[in-house]
């Protein structure tokens, strides 16, 4: 039985459809990006983030985006967290772990009537609304989030605990402080 999901979603420009390390896309929708390669569909459930790749090519592809890639400031990340609180209150989600990084988010979410992708959509919408309401997002033409999310179902208590540890430690991998969010519920 599914106990929870580990979901990862990126800000606009974080992980492109033709990302050299692979993506979950089957097409490249922007003509200007096609010169950097076709979609790099993978089916792996393991993280590919640390796979060796041509960083210069990846950064050049990001330069071809319609808008600059999004990287949250610390204040913006706090507003994203405030938006998450509103979504959690709206739908009674239980969050076991959260890391809001400059260009992506990791969450461990308890099983819910809504599918993980619907939950992510709700969280993104509330976070975006909070960024705008706080005056922290001025460019209404520039998207905040990438289109997709990645979700891994966790069906054992061991898997849930492992995912929680991974999410809690994730900021440290980027030289950031550990994060403590008021909306996170301890997993028993």
Give the residues covered by each predicted segment.
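Short catalytic/metal-binding and nucleic-acid-binding patches
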Residues: 1-188
């Amino acid at each position: 039985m599914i106990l929870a999901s580990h979901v990862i979603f990126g800000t606009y420009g974080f992980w492109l459809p033709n990302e050299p390390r692979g993506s979950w896309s089957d097409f490249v929708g922007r003509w200007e990006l096609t010169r950097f390669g076709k979609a790099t569909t993978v089916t792996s459930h393991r993280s590919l983030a640390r796979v060796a790749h041509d960083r210069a090519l990846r950064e050049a592809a990001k330069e071809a985006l319609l808008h600059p890639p999004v990287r949250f400031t610390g204040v913006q990340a706090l507003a994203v967290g405030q938006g998450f609180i509103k979504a959690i209150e709206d739908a009674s989600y239980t969050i076991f772990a959260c890391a809001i990084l400059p260009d992506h988010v990791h969450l461990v979410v308890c099983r819910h009537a809504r599918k993980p992708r619907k939950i992510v959509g709700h969280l993104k919408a509330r976070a975006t609304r909070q960024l705008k309401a706080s005056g922290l997002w001025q460019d209404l033409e520039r998207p905040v989030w990438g289109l997709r999310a990645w979700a891994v179902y966790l069906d054992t208590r061991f898997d849930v605990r492992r995912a929680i540890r991974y999410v809690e430690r994730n900021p440290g991998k980027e030289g950031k402080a550990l994060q403590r969010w008021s909306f996170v519920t301890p997993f028993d």
